[in-house]
Amino acid sequence: MSDSGAEEPRVIGIISDTHGLVRADVHTALAGVEMILHAGDVGGDDVLDELALIAPIRAVYGNTDAPGDPRLSQSIELTIGGVSIHVSHGHEVGSPTPVKLLERYSADVVVFGHTHRPLIAGGGGRLALNPGAAGPRRFDLTPSVARLTIAGGRAKAELIPLLA
């Protein structure tokens, strides 16, 4: 708490589709976050171990992750600072779109991956957030991650391009 009695903002790192690669600038992009949420297609324990050097990590399965990994969940549901968050890879709805995901999940923030396309969409106090793919460059898209800031019971997302 600050001197004014207001709660300090909570900042969560959001990453997806690493496919076995943690780029060097992920450490800078996610520095200072209290937790990292990984939306699947992790690509192995080495990725989770390296991300855990930045902050505690929770991750879900993607369509390319081996089933049965005890460090990966089907989905994650949590509440931080009064904001409910759902994390899944997105492939469970076929081709994930913000409309499909916001209809399927009731959370304030729905985090997904799979498409490799960074996206922040929503309305009515709800967000669909895809941080983009942080791993190997595919589909001529710039790799990226996101930071989710929660303050006053509201969430705001920022996409961060990865250059290295």
Label the predicted regions:
Residues 1-57, 65-74, 82, 141-144, ...:
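N-terminal active-site segment of His-dependent metallophosphoesterases
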Residues 14-16, 35-41, 58-63, 86-89, ...:
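Active-site neighborhood of phospho(di)ester-bond hydrolases with catalytic His/Asp-centered motifs
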